[in-house]
């Protein structure tokens, strides 16, 4: 009997087991689409980034002019750049939703999958920061100066680290060249981490909205969920096209349309919107070293979730108090992002400190406490067999 080609060929067999015959829980919803959408966004960002790199000059004297050249003179250059900018915003929007879905439905219980995902998130944040500096606008220059200068908070070797990153005694030509190289290379590292993420995911299997054993009822990924993914791709592409053509500079800062000038400081230095929650936490603490520590912890706190939340139920679907805590965390995250865009003055300073405290309080104390109390209540009402 002749074997099916997709099951017999050594290479195609790997693709088949990951995309065609993959056993998937029958009840997963569209919230499970965002992983594949993130893969599409990463591919589009690399493709458009490669084209932009061909026309970009990594020199402090030419960088801003080369961006103007791309927009004005390169065939469809304005669209490719706008596509790259809008794609980055949508990439982070999908990533935040993907992480939120993972918290809500208990995906952090698959520790290897969760950790590789957090590493991907941190890599994406670092890559976006490098890319923000490249146009060498006013906000790019000052954001690079402020953020890289945070390394000076490291005891003993902080100043040496800052000068190594800068390639001199201030942000300049060597800094720009290094950031271009890193902005170019890290996405390829993200591809490798993404494959590892998929490998760990397929080892344990996907979670499901009910939080039940997913092995009870599974169906092949194709055609049941592949077509749902295609719909997600079409919506994503539509949003990127609409954003690139109708609202291309919706998320960009007006100061970045002015060439970098080290003698003029912008009245309010702020990063892109997807950094604002961490930036608000950084600014909320007057001490520099503690501010940097809080900034790192704002991302690293996700690594502690598998050990902090010990719910008997995997999903929050049947945990009303955990649901309330989750949406409190989401509301606090949105408020932090808004405060990060505000000037550092009263009352925003006090609000930033309160919301920063709440951010860590929810993750480190409220989630574990509520999950413990709900476990205790469930065990008292419905004792295990």
Curated annotation (Swiss-Prot):
Key word Metal-binding present: yes
Compartments it resides in: Mitochondrion inner membrane
Binding residue positions for heme b b562: 84, 183
Record-listed a ubiquinone binding positions: 202
Single GO BP term: mitochondrial electron transport, ubiquinol to cytochrome c
Protein's UniProt keywords contain Transport: yes
GO cellular component, one term: mitochondrial inner membrane
Cofactor: binding comment: Binds 2 heme b groups non-covalently.
One example GO MF annotation: metal ion binding
Chief localization: mitochondrion
Superkingdom assignment: Eukaryota
Subunit structure as annotated in this protein's UniProt entry: The cytochrome bc1 complex contains 3 respiratory subunits (MT-CYB, CYC1 and UQCRFS1), 2 core proteins (UQCRC1 and UQCRC2) and probably 6 low-molecular weight proteins.
Function: Component of the ubiquinol-cytochrome c reductase complex (complex III or cytochrome b-c1 complex) that is part of the mitochondrial respiratory chain. The b-c1 complex mediates electron transfer from ubiquinol to cytochrome c. Contributes to the generation of a proton gradient across the mitochondrial membrane that is then used for ATP synthesis.
Protein name: Cytochrome b
Organism: Myxine glutinosa
């Amino acid at each position: 009997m002749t074997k099916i080609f997709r099951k017999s060929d050594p290479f195609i067999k790997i693709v088949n087991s990951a995309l065609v015959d993959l056993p998937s829980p029958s009840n997963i919803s569209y919230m499970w689409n965002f992983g594949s959408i993130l893969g599409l966004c990463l591919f589009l960002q690399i493709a458009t980034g490669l084209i932009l790199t061909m026309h970009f000059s990594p020199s402090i004297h030419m960088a801003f002019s080369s961006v103007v050249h791309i927009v004005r003179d390169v065939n469809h250059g304005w669209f490719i750049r706008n596509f790259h900018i809008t794609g980055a915003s949508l990439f982070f929007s999908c990533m935040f939703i993907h992480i939120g879905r993972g918290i809500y439905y208990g995906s952090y219980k698959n520790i290897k999958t969760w950790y590789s995902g957090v590493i991907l998130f941190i890599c994406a944040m670092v890559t976006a920061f490098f890319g923000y500096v490249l146009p060498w606008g006013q906000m790019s220059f000052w954001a690079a100066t402020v953020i890289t200068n945070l390394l000076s908070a490291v005891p003993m070797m902080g100043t040496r680290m800052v000068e190594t990153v800068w390639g001199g005694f201030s942000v300049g030509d060597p800094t720009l060249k290094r950031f271009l190289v890193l902005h170019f290379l890290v996405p390829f590292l993200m591809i490798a981490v993404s494959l590892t993420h998929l490998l760990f995911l397929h080892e344990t299997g996907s979670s499901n909205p009910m939080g039940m054993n997913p092995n009870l009822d599974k169906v092949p990924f194709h055609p049941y969920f592949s077509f749902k993914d295609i719909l997600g791709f079409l919506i994503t592409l539509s949003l990127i096209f609409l954003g690139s053509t109708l609202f291309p500079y919706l998320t960009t800062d007006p100061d970045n349309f002015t060439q970098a000038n080290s003698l003029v400081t912008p009245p309010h230095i702020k990063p892109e919107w997807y950094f604002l929650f961490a930036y608000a936490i950084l600014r909320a603490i007057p001490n520099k070293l503690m501010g940097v520590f809080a900034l790192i912890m704002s991302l690293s706190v996700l690594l502690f979730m598998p050990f902090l939340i010990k719910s008997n139920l995997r999903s929050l679907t049947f945990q009303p108090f955990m649901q309330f805590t989750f949406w409190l965390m989401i509301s606090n995250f949105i408020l932090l992002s808004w405060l990060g865009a505000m000037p550092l003055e009263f009352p925003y300073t006090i609000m930033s400190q309160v919301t920063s405290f709440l951010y860590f309080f929810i993750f480190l104390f409220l989630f574990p406490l509520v999950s413990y109390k709900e476990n205790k209540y469930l065990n008292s009402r419905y004792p295990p067999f």
